[in-house]
Swiss-Prot record:
SUPFAM superfamilies: GatB/YqeY motif, Glutamine synthetase/guanido kinase. This is Aspartyl/glutamyl-tRNA(Asn/Gln) amidotransferase subunit B. Heterotrimer of A, B and C subunits. Transmembrane segments: none annotated. Allows the formation of correctly charged Asn-tRNA(Asn) or Gln-tRNA(Gln) through the transamidation of misacylated Asp-tRNA(Asn) or Glu-tRNA(Gln) in organisms which lack either or both of asparaginyl-tRNA or glutaminyl-tRNA synthetases. The reaction takes place in the presence of glutamine and ATP through an activated phospho-Asp-tRNA(Asn) or phospho-Glu-tRNA(Gln). It comes from the Bacteria. Keywords: ATP-binding, Ligase, Nucleotide-binding, Protein biosynthesis. It catalyses: L-glutamyl-tRNA(Gln) + L-glutamine + ATP + H2O = L-glutaminyl-tRNA(Gln) + L-glutamate + ADP + phosphate + H(+); L-aspartyl-tRNA(Asn) + L-glutamine + ATP + H2O = L-asparaginyl-tRNA(Asn) + L-glutamate + ADP + phosphate + 2 H(+). GO terms for molecular function: asparaginyl-tRNA synthase (glutamine-hydrolyzing) activity; ATP binding; glutaminyl-tRNA synthase (glutamine-hydrolyzing) activity. One of its GO terms (biological process) is glutaminyl-tRNAGln biosynthesis via transamidation. The keyword Ligase applies. The lineage of its organism: Bacteria, Bacillati, Bacillota, Bacilli, Bacillales. Belongs to the GatB/GatE family. GatB subfamily.
Amino acid sequence: MNFETVIGLEVHVELKTKSKIFSSSPNAFGAPPNTQTNVIDLGYPGVLPVLNRQAVEFAMKAAMALNCEIATETKFDRKNYFYPDNPKAYQISQYDQPLGRNGWIEIEVNGKKKKIGITRIHLEEDAGKLTHTGDGYSLVDFNRQGTPLIEIVSEPDIRSPEEAYAYLEKLKAIIQYTGVSDCKMEEGSLRCDANISLRPLGSDKFGTKTELKNLNSFNFVRMGLEYEAKRQEKILLSGGVIRQETRRFDEATKTTVLMRVKEGSEDYRYFPEPDLVMLYIDDEWKERVRASIPELPDARRKRYIEEWGLPEYDAKVLTLTKEMADFFEATVANGADPKLASNWLMVEVSGYLNAEQKELHDIALTPESLAGMIKLIQNGTISSKIAKKVFKELVEHGGDPEKIVKEKGLVQISDEGALRKIVLEVLDANPQSVEDYKNGKDRALGFLVGQVMKATKGQANPPLVNKLLVEEIGKR
């Protein structure tokens, strides 16, 4: 029997407001434990929450960017459960009247585009953070308690781990572009739980789902789903039954491990939050927020293709993060050829960032210096090979590319007389290669070009070297 995989994702995104969702405590990552809390965060008796307007507007902005309908009336509810990182014994969330519904995003996998529905987006507060010491007790840091979150719940439209990965990449890009969150998984500002079930191919009835947690990277989401699909398939093929449960992805073994039998919504005993009034969102407020949404990845990608003639793949890679897209546009605005700028960012810059595990803002390279270097290539001052030496200096130390070229003596040799002399010396030293080229072996010319470049320490103008070699060989 063949099975179809059915996946839905629940993504929690921390909003980068200045203060928390229901209190005036600062909302910032990395402070010493329990230094960014107050009596509201800690649930002291008699205290009352006050809703953060910016958190609401950030949630609206994200929901609109994800094509959601924004509620005219929405409310908050208490989700009741006990856990050491939840001092009130309930979480303020939204249950039956979420802020946003019926959204979608478009993904592309293996050249095929597909819309993934978004069931709902709602606002809630984050819990504190537990650290298990391993010697019999746990530490609780309440700095995160009360941080504003949006939970983005997808429709069960995802049919493979690859589609799940593409959905998360696209979702992250859109949220980052809106500016409401930095979406740093390593800091917990973007977290994902996955629901997965199998059903017979062709069936429209959902199977019993399993929820996966501890998915701390997009790759772990993909690996966790791949393992869980195989685990469930094995059980079903052997005549077994899938239980509704929550499982944890084990990063060491790349398997999923049982955490607990899955709770239903009735276990949380939701009821309306009595300390917060109904929230009304009129059309004027909606339009004001909508007007603040910047150009999003798909629109930017289309513009790069139409205005600058970039290949679709280049445009897609460049717009994957707002930081890279902004850097690219600033480089072009400073006079760099768009295609050359694209190539340098996609190959050399991205390669350096990946190797060094850094972000664009961590390096000394600026759009102005990259554009300056590219213009030196364009006007023939340096070759692409020499440019790599300049690039290394710019990335690590910054500076003016023109000044670096002069100080290090890297100016490309374009003097025809000087190069012709070197070409003649190379031809005299390699008569066999000359004969090979005359006999139709084109690779011999490449060897001779390499010898000239070696003699000039990479500073000869390659097109001019080619031209002179062909001319001089023709005379022999």
